[in-house]
């Protein structure tokens, strides 16, 4: 269904993010990275999309890039405090699950 929505509205960052996150959930991190990077390019100020992208980078052992994005999210005005708290933990401990 997400693939069909993406074909209908190819430049919708939220749909692209959802598709990328679905790949992440299925542990297809390489495919997730492609979609989430595109979503971030379309919506660079969205903290959730950036967090999804950073999580994916972490799972691909691109830890420096992931930490850079997590730090960036902490500076965004639209990031809710709960997300900032979770990101602060990620900056200290990383993500529990790895490849």
Residue ranges of each PLM-predicted region?
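Conserved structural position within tetratricopeptide repeats
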Residues: 3-7, 38-41, 75
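Canonical tetratricopeptide repeat
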Residues: 18, 52, 86-90
